[in-house]
Structure formats: structure tokens, C-alpha cells
Design a protein with these regions (language model features):
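Acidic-basic catalytic patches of nuclease active cores, encompassing PD-(D/E)XK
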Residues: 1-42, 53
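Acidic/glycine-enriched edge-of-secondary-structure segments
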Residues: 31-41, 57-72
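Glycine-rich, highly charged phosphate/nucleotide-binding loops
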Residues: 41-51, 73-78
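Active-site beta-strand-loop-beta-strand hairpin of nuclease catalytic cores
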Residues: 50-62, 256
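Catalytic cores of nucleic-acid endonucleases
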Residues: 60, 65-123, 285
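Domain-level recognition of nuclease-like catalytic cores that cleave nucleotide substrates
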Residues: 98-165
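Long, charge-rich C-terminal accessory regions
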Residues: 164-330
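Charge-dense, extended regions
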Residues: 264-449
Length: 449
């Protein structure tokens, strides 16, 4: 992994991940609605993070790195502040390498602090890191930016036909105007590579889980809004209407787009069931959102959880062993989220089977209180003959006089056609919740500031 300022980016990435935030390296910045059709890269963000907030929202954090010793600290602060404004970020860190004889002036640091930015010299970062992550700092975390690149860029280099999904989750996703476009577009680009995924390959499954983590970022935003609006509704019609309104920017907008889409499908002779702009496997999606509202703060830990899962699979390590004894509900929601993404993208069924077996065995280990004694499941390969795991049933959503929405199952059929799932969509100022337990690389709300 050879990039400019790689050492500083590694420091910030590890620090952000050790604090339980969802972190990314080198996020491109495009001018939304520009003359170049959103294809011209203006600059990039060295390290970009999303952290959970107590009120079920995502808060964006900008990390800027500079090894050029003659760089003006105030100029870098203003640069980072502009990126914060563009992405709706709440805070930032500027990490500079300075000439030992020319330390950063205190007024520069005070100026940065007023703009919501921590201005830190590279030699001092270890002190900052150990203080914010007392007492050991982030060096104990097993994650690295290089490992993340091996899942994303490394897999795509070996399998170029996966590039449509890779390009989206690396570049376009974080320049979308809102998280609801991300929700739709992450599935749409997954559909484009569905015939290229081999669930028997660890690198392919890890790549799918990483993509599912991007989807989960937007899902968390959606769950946060629905929870504040309805808490834990069991009425299908209410949840259905709320989600369609939220995802399309209002009921009028939904009706307008839905009407146009229905006419297009009808003109092409499409089936009646394809004339709806809802996500693929819509009933399963409704059930997924309802399940998340039972513990909405966990929704903002799922992207981080799926990142850890992907790294464990890629590295052939015991599955989620680094988390110790996580809450079974967190694991269950992670399994349901990844399973839905695989189903919605119409990926091979074996991918969902393998994901459910990995999570199911880990849930069973935690549930029986034998995490430290029972052998951990290897992420390299799980036998397909694994015994079924008994999990608490998902909440039932009632539709008045109608039957409840079907629960997530092993073989729920998908509606045909890619449909509107290929439409675009995601912003950097979504929604997140706090964790109730501190898990490595997942979330610790006491360290969110």
C-alpha cells in the first residue's frame, strides 16, 4: 500500500477505528452537479470517519495529513474546515510534520480549536492517542488501513469485473447528497456484479461484507429516523409509508417517481410487480428495519461489525473473536443486515448461507456463555452441515386484517429485474446511536468526543 503520507493516514485510521468509528482512507471529493457530470475529482479526504452520536445520528469527522514541513498550519486548518463544511462534519484533526525547530504557534492551535479542529504535530500524536484511548492508545488494535485496502482495492485488482461496486463504495457513495440515495445505490451497484461473486472465495465474501457495511451506514440513518418517528411500530402500512416517504424525500416525490417508473415498466411490457420503486425484497427490508428498532443504537455499530467480520474472513482468523463477548442482538442484527444485502443484490444463495452459519455459530457461542471456553469458528471455512441455531424470533409486523410480513428466511425469492434499485444515492451527515458496551473497533460512546 504505497500512497502519499501513508504513515500519518495509518495513525489516524487506527485511532478512529480504535474509538469505534467507521473509517475510510482517501475518499475522493467531487463537485456535485458540476459541468463534468460528477466525474471530475477535485481533491480527496485523507481519512474520513463516521462516529455514532447519542441521538441516533452519524457525525462526520475529517482527518487531514501533511508531511511537507514548510506547510502553514493555519492554511491546513482552513483547508480542513472547508472539507468539514462540504461534508457536514462536526470536527476534524489536522496532523502535521514540522521542523523540530519550528513548532506550531499556540495561536494557530487556538485558531484551529475555534473551528472545531485539533491541530497536532506528528511527534505529539502518540500523547493525544494514548490520552483519548487511555491508557494504551490505538496501537493495540489489530486493524490497519493496509488490511482494508487488501479487501477493497486488492480484491478488485484480482477481479476487475467487480470494479463497478468497488468504484461506488470507494468514491461515489460518500459524495451522494443523502444517505437514502446511498441506500438505493449500494444495492443497485451490487446488482451489477451479482454474476461475478463466488461465495466460496474468502476474498469475495469479505468484499461483499465490506459493501454490506456501506449499505448499513445508510440503513442506520433510516432506522434512527423511523425510531424517532414511530418507536417500534408493528403496523405494516405505517412502516411501509414512512420508509417510502423518507427514502424518496416526501410523499409527493415518491408518488411522482413511482408513477413515472410504472409507466416505463408498462411501456416495456414488464410485470405488474415490477412497477414499484421500493427496494428489492421489500417485505424483508421492512422486517429488517423493524428488527433494528428493538435496539436502534446497535444499528450504528453494524458497519463497524461487518468491517471486522470482513477482515477476519480475509485473514482466516477466528470469526469476530476480537470482540470478546458481544451482545447477541448486535450479532443477530449484523447477520440480518448482511443477509438482506446479499438477497437484495441477488448474489448467490451460498453467500447468505455462509454468512448465516458464521454469525449463527458466533451467536450460539456467546448465548451459552462459553465464549472463552468453546472453540471459535474459523472464518476461513464453515461446514455447510452446521447445526441450526435457535434465535429469538423477529418482531411481527401486522397489516391490520392482513397477514404479517414474512420473516427473513433462507430462501426468500427476489422480484425479477433490477428496477429502480439501480437509482443513485448517500451523504456524510447521516444518523448514529451509542453503544452500551465497549467492544474493540465497534463503539464506545464515552470516547466519541
Amino acid at each position: 500500500w504505497k500512497v502519499k503520507d501513508a504513515g500519518q493516514k495509518e495513525l489516524l485510521y487506527r485511532h478512529f477505528r480504535a474509538r469505534g468509528w467507521y473509517a475510510l482512507i482517501e475518499v475522493p471529493v467531487y463537485n456535485r452537479g458540476g459541468e463534468s457530470g460528477n466525474k471530475y475529482q477535485i481533491t480527496d479526504i485523507d481519512v474520513f470517519a463516521l462516529r455514532p452520536s447519542p441521538d441516533l445520528r452519524w457525525e462526520a469527522v475529517i482527518g487531514d495529513c501533511k508531511t511537507k514541513k514548510g506547510e502553514s498550519p493555519a492554511n491546513r486548518v482552513l483547508w480542513a474546515r472547508a472539507l468539514m463544511d462540504q461534508f457536514g462534519a462536526t470536527s476534524g484533526i489536522v496532523l502535521l510534520r514540522r521542523d523540530p525547530k519550528k513548532a506550531i504557534e499556540p495561536d494557530h492551535k487556538l485558531f484551529a480549536q475555534k473551528l472545531g479542529i485539533a491541530l497536532i504535530e506528528e511527534p505529539d500524536f502518540e500523547v493525544y492517542d494514548r490520552a483519548m484511548l487511555y491508557p494504551s492508545g490505538s496501537k493495540t488494535t489489530s486493524e490497519s488501513a493496509a488490511a482494508l485496502q487488501s479487501i477493497r482495492m486488492g480484491t478488485c485488482e484480482r477481479f476487475p469485473k467487480l470494479s463497478p461496486l468497488y468504484d461506488y463504495i470507494k468514491e461515489r457513495a460518500w459524495n451522494e447528497p443523502d444517505h437514502f440515495m446511498l441506500l438505493r445505490n449500494s444495492i443497485g451497484h451490487g446488482l451489477k456484479v451479482r454474476s461475478e461473486i463466488d461465495p466460496g472465495r474468502d476474498d469475495h465474501l469479505a468484499f461483499v461484507l465490506e459493501a454490506a457495511g456501506v449499505f448499513a451506514v445508510a440503513l442506520a440513518t433510516c432506522v434512527g429516523i423511523v425510531f424517532h418517528q414511530y418507536l417500534q411500530t408493528n403496523q405494516r402500512q405505517a412502516l411501509d409509508g414512512a420508509l417510502k416517504t423518507i427514502m424518496w424525500g416526501g410523499r409527493e416525490q415518491y408518488d411522482y417517481i413511482s408513477g413515472i417508473w410504472a409507466k416505463l415498466v408498462e411501456a416495456k411490457g414488464g410485470a405488474e410487480e415490477h412497477r414499484d420503486v421500493s427496494l428489492p425484497a421489500w417485505n424483508t427490508f421492512l422486517q429488517l428495519v423493524r428488527s433494528h428498532t428493538d435496539a436502534p443504537h446497535f444499528s450504528f455499530q453494524i458497519p463497524q461489525l461487518l468491517r471486522v467480520a470482513a477482515l477476519d474472513i480475509m485473514g482466516s482468523r477466528p470469526f469476530l473473536a476480537s470482540l470478546g463477548s458481544p451482545d447477541p442482538m448486535l450479532l443477530k442484527l449484523g447477520m440480518l443486515t448482511a443477509s438482506y444485502y446479499i438477497e437484495a443484490c441477488r448474489l448467490p444463495l451460498d453467500a447468505k448461507t455462509r454468512v448465516k452459519e458464521l454469525f449463527g455459530r458466533r451467536i450460539a457461542t456467546v448465548a451459552i456463555g462459553a465464549s472463552s471456553a468453546a472453540p471459535l469458528v474459523s472464518a476461513e471455512r464453515v461446514p455447510t452441515t452446521a447445526a441450526s441455531i435457535s434465535l429469538p424470533p423477529p418482531p411481527t409486523i401486522n397489516s391490520g386484517s392482513s397477514s404479517p410480513i414474512e420473516a427473513v428466511t433462507e430462501a426468500t425469492s427476489l422480484r425479477g429485474g433490477d428496477g429502480p434499485a439501480q437509482a443513485s444515492g448517500v451523504s456524510s451527515s447521516g444518523t448514529v446511536g451509542t453503544a452500551q458496551t465497549a467492544l474493540p473497533g465497534i463503539a464506545d460512546p464515552s470516547r466519541n468526543r
